[in-house]
C-alpha cells in the first residue's frame, strides 16, 4: 500500500477553479465515504483550506486509484476531467509524504510560514479518524506531518513576522483606509470560525476602535465579541440578517464563512453605503477570504469600495519569508522525511523477520518432538537443557542477519533485502501475512509505466496524463 495525493491549490489554479473544488465541512464526510467505497482505496484524508484542496489516499493500485480520485473531484466540482487536469497535481509514495510535510511547515502556503495550516491538517486528520478512514499509514503520516510542522515553527524564524492570510489582508486594508491605519476605526467580521477569531485577534493588536461580529448564530458571534471585549475593544454581536446595518458603520469588513453563495451582495452593500450619516467619501475595504468567495464580484465596482480577495493577496510581497528561514525549514523537512521513510521501510521488513524467527521456532519444536520419539527415556532436565541449547544456537545464527537486514532495509531501496530473505528461507507470502497486521502489508504496485522525476509522476496511461504534467523537470502544469 502506498499514499497517493491529488490536489489543487493557489499555486496551480485561479480562485474560480478553487471555488469549484472547495470542500466544506459538510462535504468532507460524504466525499470521504465515496473514497472508501472505491475499489483501490483503503484509507482517505481530505485537507481543505481557503487556498487548497488535497486528497490523501492509501491505495493498492496507482492508475486505478488515480482515476477514481479524479472522477470524484470532477463530479464534486462540476469540472470536466480536461479542465481539472490543467490545475491538478499528483504526488505518490515518498513524494506525497514530502509534500504534506512541506505543507504542514507552511512552505507551500500562500503566506509562507503561516501556522494556521497546522490546525487545518489536524482538523482533516481528526475528521478522517472519526470516520475510521485513517488506518496505520495515514495515522503515522498525519501525526508525523504535524510533528514536522511544529518543529519547523519552533526551530526556525519562518513565522517570526506572525504573518497569515488575515494579517496580510488587514495590513493592506490599513494602508487603504487612510491616515492612522486601523487605529480607532470600526471593523465588521463576518463568520465566527477560526478565520473570524484570527481576524479579531489581529484587529485588536492593530488598535481597532470597535468590532462588530456577524454570524448566522448570534451565540457564536457573542462568544467572539466577548474575546474582543476582554482585550479592551468595544464589540457587538449581530445575526447575519443585520449585516447591511453593520456595514453602514464599517471602515473594514473581513469575511470568511465557507458558505455556498454570496454573503455580501451588491444590493446589501449599496444599501449600506446609502445609509444616512455615512460619509460618501468614507472608503470601505472588504477582505474576502472565503472559498468559495463570500462577496459578489459586482461589489468591487462600487465607488469607494475596495475588495481584497485571495487572488490579489497572493501577489502581496508580505506573503514571502526570509530565504534563510525557508532554507532552514526545508532542511528540517528533508531530515524528517528521511527518518520517516526509514521507519516505513523498517516496518515493511519487520513481518518478514518475524516470519523467519517463527519458521525457526517451528523447526526447533519439530526437531525436539523428533528427539522425544527417538529418545523416549530422556528425563525432563536433560530434555530442557537440549531445548535451551538448540534455541540458543538458532538465536545466535539468526541474530546477525536479522539485525543487518533491518539496517539495510531502512535505507533507500532496501525493500530488496526483505525479498531476498523471503527467497533464501522459502518464506511464503502466507507465512509473512500471518504475522503482520492487515495494515502493515505492503501492496505490490506495477510502476513499470511510471516515471517519477523530482517527486512528480508522468506516465503513458491516458488516465494518468489527465492529472499530471509531462514536464520532465517536475513543474506543475499551469496551462
Curated annotation (Swiss-Prot):
Q: Name one Pfam family in it.
A: GlutR_N
Name of the protein: Glutamyl-tRNA reductase
Catalysis performed (reactions): (S)-4-amino-5-oxopentanoate + tRNA(Glu) + NADP(+) = L-glutamyl-tRNA(Glu) + NADPH + H(+)
Recorded hits in NCBIfam families, A to Z, give: hemA, PRK00045.1-3
Could you tell me the EC number(s) of this protein?
1.2.1.70
User: Which organism does this sequence originate in?
Assistant: Rhodococcus jostii (strain RHA1)
- Gene Ontology molecular function terms on file: glutamyl-tRNA reductase activity; NADP binding
Acyltransferase: present as a keyword of the record? no
* Annotated GO biological process: protoporphyrinogen IX biosynthetic process from glutamate
Q: In which pathway does it act?
A: Porphyrin-containing compound metabolism; protoporphyrin-IX biosynthesis; 5-aminolevulinate from L-glutamyl-tRNA(Glu): step 1/2
Comment, domains: Possesses an unusual extended V-shaped dimeric structure with each monomer consisting of three distinct domains arranged along a curved 'spinal' alpha-helix. The N-terminal catalytic domain specifically recognizes the glutamate moiety of the substrate. The second domain is the NADPH-binding domain, and the third C-terminal domain is responsible for dimerization.
Under HAMAP family, the record lists: Glu_tRNA_reductase
Enumerate the active-site residues.
50 (nucleophile)
**Residues noted as binding NADP(+) in the record, renumbered to the chain:** 191-196
Q: Describe the family membership recorded for this protein in Swiss-Prot or TrEMBL.
A: Belongs to the glutamyl-tRNA reductase family.
PANTHER family according to UniProt: GLUTAMYL-TRNA REDUCTASE
Question: In which domain of life is the source organism classified?
Answer: Bacteria
Its biological purpose is as follows: Catalyzes the NADPH-dependent reduction of glutamyl-tRNA(Glu) to glutamate 1-semialdehyde (GSA).
Q: Mind telling me which residues the site (Important for activity) is annotated on?
A: 99
The positions annotated for binding substrate are 49-52, 109, 114-116, 120
Name the gene that codes for it. hemA
What additional remark is attached to this entry? During catalysis, the active site Cys acts as a nucleophile attacking the alpha-carbonyl group of tRNA-bound glutamate with the formation of a thioester intermediate between enzyme and glutamate, and the concomitant release of tRNA(Glu). The thioester intermediate is finally reduced by direct hydride transfer from NADPH, to form the product GSA.
Amino acid at each position: 500500500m502506498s499514499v497517493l495525493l491529488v490536489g489543487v491549490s493557489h499555486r496551480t489554479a485561479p480562485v474560480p477553479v478553487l471555488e469549484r473544488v472547495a470542500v466544506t465541512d459538510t462535504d468532507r464526510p460524504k466525499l470521504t465515504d465515496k473514497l472508501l467505497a472505491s475499489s483501490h482505496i483503503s484509507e482517505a484524508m481530505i485537507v481543505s483550506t481557503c487556498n487548497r484542496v488535497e486528497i490523501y489516499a492509501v491505495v493498492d493500485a496507482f492508475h486505478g486509484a488515480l482515476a477514481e480520485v479524479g472522477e470524484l473531484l470532477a463530479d464534486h466540482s462540476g469540472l470536466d476531467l480536461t479542465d481539472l487536469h490543467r490545475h491538478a497535481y499528483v504526488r505518490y509514495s515518498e513524494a506525497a509524504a514530502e509534500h504534506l510535510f512541506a505543507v504542514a511547515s507552511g512552505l507551500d502556503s500562500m503566506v509562507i510560514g503561516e501556522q494556521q495550516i497546522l490546525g487545518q491538517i489536524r482538523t482533516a486528520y481528526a475528521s478522517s479518524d472519526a470516520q475510521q478512514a485513517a488506518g496505520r499509514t495515514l495515522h503515522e503520516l498525519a501525526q508525523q506531518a504535524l510533528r514536522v510542522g511544529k518543529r519547523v515553527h519552533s526551530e526556525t524564524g519562518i513565522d517570526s513576522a506572525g504573518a497569515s492570510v488575515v494579517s496580510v489582508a488587514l495590513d493592506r486594508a490599513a494602508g487603504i483606509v487612510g491616515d492612522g491605519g486601523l487605529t480607532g476605526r470600526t471593523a465588521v467580521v463576518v463568520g465566527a470560525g477560526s478565520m473570524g477569531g484570527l481576524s479579531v485577534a489581529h484587529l485588536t493588536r492593530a488598535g481597532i476602535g470597535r468590532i462588530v461580529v456577524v454570524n448566522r448564530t448570534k451565540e457564536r458571534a457573542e462568544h467572539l465579541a466577548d474575546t474582543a471585549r476582554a482585550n479592551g475593544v468595544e464589540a457587538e454581536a449581530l445575526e447575519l440578517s443585520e449585516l447591511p446595518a453593520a456595514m453602514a458603520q464599517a471602515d473594514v469588513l473581513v469575511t470568511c464563512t465557507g458558505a455556498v453563495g454570496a454573503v455580501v451582495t451588491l444590493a446589501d452593500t449599496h444599501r449600506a453605503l446609502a445609509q444616512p450619516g455615512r460619509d460618501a467619501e468614507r472608503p470601505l475595504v472588504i477582505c474576502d477570504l472565503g472559498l468559495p468567495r463570500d462577496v459578489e464580484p459586482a461589489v468591487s465596482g462600487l465607488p469607494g469600495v475596495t475588495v481584497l480577495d485571495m487572488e490579489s493577496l497572493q501577489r502581496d510581497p508580505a506573503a514571502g519569508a526570509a530565504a534563510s528561514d525557508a532554507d532552514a525549514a526545508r532542511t528540517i523537512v528533508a531530515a524528517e522525511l528521511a527518518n520517516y521513510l526509514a521507519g516505513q521501510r523498517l516496518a515493511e521488513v519487520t513481518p518478514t523477520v518475524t516470519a523467519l524467527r517463527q519458521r525457526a521456532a517451528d523447526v526447533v519444536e519439530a526437531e525436539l518432538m523428533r528427539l522425544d520419539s527417538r529418545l523416549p527415556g530422556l528425563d525432563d532436565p536433560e530434555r530442557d537443557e537440549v531445548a535451551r541449547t538448540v534455541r540458543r544456537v538458532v538465536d545466535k545464527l539468526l541474530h546477525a542477519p536479522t539485525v543487518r537486514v533491518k539496517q539495510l532495509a531502512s535505507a533507500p531501496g532496501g525493500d530488496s533485502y526483505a525479498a531476498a530473505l523471503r527467497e533464501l528461507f522459502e518464506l511464503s507470502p502466507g507465512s509473512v501475512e500471518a504475522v503482520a497486521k492487515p495494515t502493515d502489508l505492503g501492496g505490490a504496485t506495477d510502476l513499470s509505466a511510471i516515471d517519477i522525476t523530482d517527486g512528480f509522476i508522468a506516465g503513458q496511461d491516458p488516465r494518468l496524463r489527465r492529472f499530471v504534467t509531462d514536464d520532465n523537470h517536475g513543474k506543475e502544469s499551469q496551462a
